[in-house]
């Protein structure tokens, strides 16, 4: 019985460590030896919520717009490091969920809130240029796009087409290490 308890406890601790994925473990747990990025498990429960953006799309030719909620998470140590040094450490992972929104009148007023997931993005900090031959890695980051429910990245190049064009959205924040941080000041402190 004692042996069973020790084995069970070890498995539970191991599962918890894998789900939390500290920055020191990123390249052992979330990134394979060729640079393929996996979506971390349970990041909503174990990582730090950085903030949200409510984003209205540009009007389509028919004048329609959509509204999305962008919600961002990272590992707790990445926040501690950022507060101290003003940058994300090697192995930091930023996860951005893009969700559709619903809007309805509530007793407190007209409210918009996140609804169905549309896509999930990940950025993995790489200060050592580990994957120079992989087009999904450039400018000090690994870039990934995940469809909801699929832990396999759809990104083959960070300068791809459509939603896989990470470069197009991040070029305005190139001077800020390619990250939009203005919505995270209450957490990051800078």
Model-derived regions, located:
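Positively charged n-region of N-terminal signal peptides that target proteins for export
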Residues: 1-4
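Small-residue packing motifs within transmembrane alpha-helices
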Residues: 6, 10-11
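N-terminal signal peptide c-region/cleavage motif recognized by signal peptidases
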Residues: 14-15
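Sequence context surrounding c-type heme c attachment/ligation sites in exported
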Residues: 21-24, 31-32, 39, 43-48, ...
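Short, functionally important structural connectors and interaction interfaces within domains
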Residues: 29-31, 35, 80
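Secreted/periplasmic proteins
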Residues: 49-72
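N-terminal post-signal-peptidase region of extra-cytosolic proteins
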Residues: 66-83, 106-108
């Amino acid at each position: 019985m004692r042996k069973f308890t020790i084995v069970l406890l070890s498995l539970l601790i191991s599962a918890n460590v894998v789900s939390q994925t500290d920055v020191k473990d990123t390249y052992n747990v979330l990134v394979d030896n060729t640079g393929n990025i996996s979506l971390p498990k349970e990041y909503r429960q174990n990582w730090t919520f950085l903030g949200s953006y409510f984003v209205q799309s540009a009007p389509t030719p028919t004048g329609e717009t959509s509204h999305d909620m962008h919600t961002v998470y990272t590992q707790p140590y990445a926040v501690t490091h950022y507060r101290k040094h003003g940058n994300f450490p090697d192995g930091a992972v930023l996860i951005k969920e893009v969700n559709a929104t619903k809007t309805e009148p509530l007793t407190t007023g007209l409210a918009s809130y996140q609804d169905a997931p549309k896509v999930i993005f990940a950025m993995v900090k790489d200060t050592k240029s580990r994957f120079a031959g992989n087009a999904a890695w450039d400018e000090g980051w690994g870039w990934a796009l995940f469809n909801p429910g699929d832990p396999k990245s759809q990104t083959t190049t960070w300068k791809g087409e459509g939603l896989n064009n990470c470069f197009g959205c991040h070029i305005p924040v190139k001077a800020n290490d390619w990250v939009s941080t203005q919505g995270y000041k209450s957490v990051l402190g800078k």
